[in-house]
Amino acid sequence: FILSIQKNEFNINIDRNDQPDLENIEHNYLNSGGQFWLAINNHQNIVGTIGLIRLDNNMSALKKMFVDEGYRNLKIGKKLLDKVIMTCKEQNIDGIYLGTIDKFISAQYFYSNNGFREIKRGDLPSSFPKLDVDNRFYYRNLKD
């Protein structure tokens, strides 16, 4: 699902080997205190994903937020993000970092409209899992 959107829709030069976290979601997300959610339609097809990784110092990373092209603008992304934010607040996480790419223009507007502000790569915590293709980074403070 994720790789199909990255490669087929956005022509991103990335493959499964560049995203080892997807090979073992239990180990890379769940066992470290994070989560990984799926949005499923009435036909039991995946139409959205979002992941949360715990970082050092009560911080977290938002990963793998994707919504199927046919299901965008139906508030699925907003519901997934709201679930992440609620989970972070329940776990006393102070902030959420994320990386994206400049081709995901709609995603950048989405993050900005949902309380994220753009930051520089150098402002990311050292424990943030960076992808080589990421060239835009965002942060949302949850303490306020």
Where do the protein language model's features map onto the residues?
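C-terminal "cap" of GNAT-fold acetyltransferases
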Residues: 94-97, 101-105, 109-144
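Conserved residues at beta->alpha junctions
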Residues: 67, 91, 102
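Residue-level signal for short amphipathic helical patches enriched in basic/charged
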Residues: 13, 91, 99
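A short linear-motif detector with a strong N-terminal bias
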Residues: 14-18, 59, 76, 96, ...
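Acetyl-CoA-dependent GNAT
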Residues: 1-63, 68-69, 81-83, 87, ...
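Glycine-rich phosphate-binding loop
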Residues: 71, 75
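Conserved acyl-CoA
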Residues: 79-96, 110
